[in-house]
Regions:
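Amphipathic, Lys/Arg-enriched alpha-helical "gate/interface" segment within cytosolic domains
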Residues: 1-135
């Protein structure tokens, strides 16, 4: 129970955060301020983040947008997309609200997806667009 984090693939281009059962905003802050920057600092290339809320009990929604904004603004320059997976209607509403309120590089890089498979496809769209720009 809580939050676990691991590399989703051997290439270290995607980090999977799994929110399972109960967790706290303190757990979230530890993850986003310590663990995530360390992992993302291991590699020079773009890293996408899949945050799986499928089996999560969300703590109080008070301050959720502020917590998310501070977390994302602290990620390294190699941060690609954040894709929130399997969230309930409240989580999906918060993702959409976040995208509208922070309509800049942070909001434009944040998405919701119903499954990990769809989230992976969204991450690959970023990579395809980046490759096309590099050619």
């Amino acid at each position: 129970m809580g939050i676990s984090v691991e590399w989703y693939n051997e290439e270290k281009t995607i980090i999977l955060q799994t929110y399972d059962g109960r967790w706290t905003w303190e757990d979230f802050q530890d993850l986003t301020r310590v663990i995530m920057p360390k992992m993302m600092g291991e590699v020079p290339h773009t890293v996408h983040i899949l945050s799986d809320f499928t089996n999560s009990d969300i703590p109080s929604m008070n301050g959720a947008l502020t917590h998310a904004k501070h977390a994302l603004s602290g990620y390294g320059d190699n941060w690609g997309y954040l894709i929130v997976v399997g969230g309930n209607s409240m989580v999906n509403m918060l993702v959409n609200l976040f995208r509208q309120l922070f309509n800049n590089s942070v909001g434009n890089k944040t998405f919701a997806a119903p499954t990990l498979e769809v989230a992976f496809d969204i991450a690959m769209q970023y990579d395809d667009a980046y490759e096309a720009m590099s050619e």
